[in-house]
């Protein structure tokens, strides 16, 4: 049985003080959650949020990282530094990173491996554009991303990866994939993992849905057999909304 995982991606929102306020509001609301709870604040708020969540059931994710341990990479953050900070997860390959910062699958593969080298679990994002969905190539697109991004991992590592399926056309638009579409695509992603690493690994991998997840959508989404959680954007910025999703 896979433990559900609900992660809140705060994106470029919340100052340090606002992040602390949100965490303090959130802690009592999710303390009895059956799902694993993760929040991803901005880089400047990471240390504050890590310290504020100590002793709670909330884990902390970074929103991105570089694959090199150190060097002349102005503005980047190393996984080595994130490990020392006490970060548990790192979001990799979010569609905004792929789209606005030209992240490639080659770089993401290096990042996934570097995350494991520093005991940080990747939340690996994949998804298709509206054009790709309408051309009926969703499974080809996500399958290719997964094959490239997870290439060279051991079965043990692959089983720990969290995958987030996020149809790009549903992010921040208010549109969502139907529960059936999400379940079907996530099933196809799981099949790709099975082909790469075997059935046992595929059955362990947790795959989230991301794309305008709200308190009024989560219950039906989580009722689908392939969906193991959610990567939540805007709704994670309000403690009550995010708690309602966590406590689906």
UniProtKB/Swiss-Prot annotation:
It comes from the Bacteria. InterPro entries: Aldolase_TIM, TIM_sf, TrioseP_Isoase_bac/euk, Triosephosphate_isomerase, Triosephosphate_isomerase_AS. One of its GO terms (cellular component) is cytosol. It is an enzyme of class 5 (isomerase). Substrate binds at residues 9-11, 172, 212, 233-234. It is found in: Cytoplasm. Pathway: Carbohydrate biosynthesis; gluconeogenesis; Carbohydrate degradation; glycolysis; D-glyceraldehyde 3-phosphate from glycerone phosphate: step 1/1. The keyword Cytoplasm applies. GO terms for molecular function: triose-phosphate isomerase activity. Pfam families: TIM (PF00121). Keywords: Cytoplasm, Gluconeogenesis, Glycolysis, Isomerase. Its main location: cytoplasm. Gene3D superfamilies: Aldolase class I (3.20.20.70). The keyword Cytoplasm applies. The active site is at residues 94, 166. It catalyses: D-glyceraldehyde 3-phosphate = dihydroxyacetone phosphate. Belongs to the triosephosphate isomerase family. Homodimer. Involved in the gluconeogenesis. Catalyzes stereospecifically the conversion of dihydroxyacetone phosphate (DHAP) to D-glyceraldehyde-3-phosphate (G3P). This is Triosephosphate isomerase. It comes from Clostridium acetobutylicum (strain ATCC 824 / DSM 792 / JCM 1419 / IAM 19013 / LMG 5710 / NBRC 13948 / NRRL B-527 / VKM B-1787 / 2291 / W). The gene is tpiA.
């Amino acid at each position: 049985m896979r433990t559900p995982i609900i992660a809140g991606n705060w994106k470029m929102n919340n100052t340090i003080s606002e992040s602390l306020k949100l965490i303090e509001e959130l802690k009592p609301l999710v303390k009895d959650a059956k799902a694993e709870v993760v929040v991803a604040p901005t880089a400047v708020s990471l240390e504050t949020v890590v310290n504020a969540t100590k002793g709670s059931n909330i884990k902390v994710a970074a929103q991105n990282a570089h694959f090199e341990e150190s060097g002349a990479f102005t503005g980047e953050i190393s996984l080595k530094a994130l490990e020392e900070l006490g970060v548990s997860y790192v979001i990799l390959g979010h569609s905004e990173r792929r789209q606005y910062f030209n992240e490639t699958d080659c770089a993401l593969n290096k990042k996934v491996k570097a995350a494991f080298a520093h005991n940080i679990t990747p939340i690996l994002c994949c998804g298709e554009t509206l054009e790709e969905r309408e051309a009926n190539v969703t499974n080809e697109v996500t399958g290719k991303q997964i094959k490239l991004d997870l290439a060279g991992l051991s079965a043990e590592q692959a089983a720990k990866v969290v995958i987030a399926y996020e149809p790009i056309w549903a992010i921040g638009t208010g549109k969502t994939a139907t529960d059936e579409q999400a379940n079907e695509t996530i099933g196809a992603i799981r099949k790709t993992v099975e082909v790469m690493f075997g059935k046992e690994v595929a059955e362990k991998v947790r795959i989230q849905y991301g794309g305008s997840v709200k308190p009024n959508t989560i219950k039906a989404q989580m009722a689908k057999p392939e969906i193991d959680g959610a990567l939540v954007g805007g709704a994670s910025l309000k403690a009550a909304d995010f708690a309602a999703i966590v406590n689906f």
